[in-house]
Regions:
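Conserved catalytic or regulatory cores that recognize and/or transform ribose-phosphate-containing ligands
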Residues: 1-168
């Protein structure tokens, strides 16, 4: 756990994507959050064996960490033990069913949810997604800035001037 004791679970599409598409933004955002004492939880941790996959499937029964049951259980556990949910839906070409489950669990358990998606053309633009979110923004940069303020680890005026690396 980070110095603050706070955790963020990083929700976003996985199925049909490459390993790098799934991991890159989570690693980049995780580094920033951890620099401020916030633990970043990724559903891709411990899954380096998927690096060669061109299009990740919903499960891999031959890998204990990637069976349907294991994915469902760990992702739900991570979602419920997190204080915040950062849901990256940018550039989605189809609805992420797993992400929608995670948003529902988080909303039902009173988590602070930041959804990141385009203002137009995203298949997740729907009343349920928008109403389950505490905040909807259009960039990871904006999401991280808001998260740092809400987590009370950075002053609202200072966070505007904060230099962040490229996150997506």
């Amino acid at each position: 756990m980070g110095k603050t004791g706070l955790r963020v679970y990083m929700v976003g599409g996985i199925q049909g994507m490459t390993y790098d598409e799934c991991v890159k933004w989570r690693v980049n955002v995780g580094k920033v959050l951890e620099a401020y004492g916030i633990e970043a939880l990724s559903p891709m941790r411990g899954k380096a064996y998927l690096q060669r996959e061109v299009s990740i499937k919903d499960s891999y029964e031959q890998h204990k960490m990637s069976t349907k049951a294991a994915i469902f259980a760990r992702d739900k556990w991570d979602c419920l033990r997190a204080d915040f949910i950062l849901c990256n839906l940018l550039k989605a070409s189809s609805v992420s069913i797993g992400s929608m489950f995670e948003l529902a669990w988080a909303q039902d358990h009173g988590k602070y949810i930041i959804v990141v998606m385009e203002d137009e053309g995203n298949p997740h633009i729907h009343g349920f997604v928008q109403e389950s979110a505490s905040l909807v923004v259009s960039s990871l940069d904006e999401a991280v800035r808001h998260l740092l303020v809400v987590a009370n680890v950075y002053d609202e005026n200072q966070v505007k001037a904060l230099e962040l690396p490229k996150l997506d």
